Structure formats: structure tokens, C-alpha cells
Amino acid sequence: MKVRKGDTVLVIAGKDKGAKGKVLKAYPDRERVLVEGVNRIKKHTAISTNQRGAQSGGIVTQEAPIHVSNVMVVDSDGKPARVGYRLDEETGKRVRISKRNGKDI
């Protein structure tokens, strides 16, 4: 999966199309990412009381994971780009690059 935690992404499909956000968590086995401020849902949780007597629960708004095919990584210029790889000569490791301008992401 070419999208990682900490990347800034642009939503290219769905109800939040055009929104930018930071990837909070990646789920590579499910091919989904959790993006800050995108795909917000209302979750109903049971009201419970903790030991101090404070109540928690009710209707909570939170982000839900979105499929990676619906997002594009934003490169250093602030524009969406496809992600490629190249081999770093010094370290011998794979480095992610922007296919749009060839720079490192």
C-alpha cells in the first residue's frame, strides 16, 4: 500500500470529494486509511458511569476508514500525485517519489 500514516491526502471520490486531511492510521490488510476530518459518522454508544460518577456515551461523531483507491497522496508542491518507488543509491532502500515531479515524498 502506497499511502502511509502521516501522509497528507486528497479525497478524489465519495461524499467528501475534494477534502484534504492527514492519515491518522493505515489498515494495509483491509486496504483502508483513517483520514482526519473525512468520512465522519455518528456512533451510538451506551451511556455508562465511571467510578467517579461521570457519565460517558451517547452519540459520538468520529472518522471512519476510507478505501485507499478514493484518496491520492499530496506531494511537496501541494498537488495530488501518484506514488512510485526508486532505489536510494546510498542506503539501498526503496524511497517513495511523486510520479508528477519526481521528488521524494
UniProtKB/Swiss-Prot annotation:
One of two assembly initiator proteins, it binds directly to the 5'-end of the 23S rRNA, where it nucleates assembly of the 50S subunit. Belongs to the universal ribosomal protein uL24 family. One of its GO terms (cellular component) is ribonucleoprotein complex. Part of the 50S ribosomal subunit. One of its GO terms (molecular function) is structural constituent of ribosome. PANTHER family: MITOCHONDRIAL RIBOSOMAL PROTEIN L24. The lineage of its organism: Bacteria, Bacillati, Actinomycetota, Actinomycetes, Mycobacteriales. SUPFAM superfamilies: Translation proteins SH3-like domain. SMART domains: KOW. This is Large ribosomal subunit protein uL24. The keyword DNA repair does not apply. GO terms for biological process: translation. Keywords: Ribonucleoprotein, Ribosomal protein, RNA-binding, rRNA-binding.
